[in-house]
Amino acid sequence: MSDLRQIAFYGKGGIGKSTTSQNTLAALVDLGQKILIVGCDPKADSTRLILNAKAQDTVLHLAAQEGSVEDLELEDVLKAGYKGIKCVESGGPEPGVGCAGRGVITSINFLEENGAYDDVDYVSYDVLGDVVCGGFAMPIRENKAQEIYIVMSGEMMALYAANNIAKGILKYAHSGGVRLGGLICNERQTDRELDLSEALAARLNSKLIHFVPRDNIVQHAELRKMTVIQYAPDSKQAGEYRALAEKIHANSGQGTIPTPITMEELEDMLLDFGIMKSDEQMLAELQAKESAVVAAQ
């Protein structure tokens, strides 16, 4: 158990976090690692590409059916997928009712008590990261996840979420062993995306672990409920995920305590990269358009 690496993938909704994590973990198992995935996203889509199936039944859903979590057996919630990867989805309540983080807390406690963490090299938490509320921060707060990898892109809200997640890590870094492992950029083909990702990583006292290029083969594999590693193992994109997996595998003990920036500093960075226009630029453009309209009359 001393060699167990507990990693977590955080990122804003829709960033491709679950797809990136599952492809990376499929590549890690190909390196001979034994893996347990704990899905901590209410969408419960953290394991479907590994299981080649629709979203699996969640711990909270099964507990509600049986009466309580104490009535469940480990085999009820744990399914084996690609090359023996163990998969669990914590789940969440009905929309608008209760705290979605409660499922995370309930699941992790149940799994630990029932020996799910025995005989694995990696436990990977796939966590929603738009908001780092108490429940979703649980893998960080309770000193479970030791290495956090933030999946982001060059889009403003993805950068904003990455900075917020870094704030959550910083809050618990001194009381526990949690560290920021690095950023993973899931390309959205925005302007100067690689440069911007590297710059944000540097500002956060971290590094860009890997830049994952955009490729439609990812969607083709997803439609078949498969990772690219399984669907097209010889493809260039599969090679990208293998490179990412190797970098994470080599990154043990190299995490850092992040240095999040303010919203103003983030906006200044976007201005420096020409991604966002200043008020003066926008006003000048508006005046130029108005002048052109007047001149045309």
Swiss-Prot record:
The keyword Electron transport does not apply. The gene is nifH. This is Nitrogenase iron protein. Homodimer. Coiled coil: none annotated. Binds 1 [4Fe-4S] cluster per dimer. GO terms for biological process: nitrogen fixation. It comes from Rhizobium etli. The modification ADP-ribosylarginine is found at residue 102. [4Fe-4S] cluster binds at residues 99, 133.
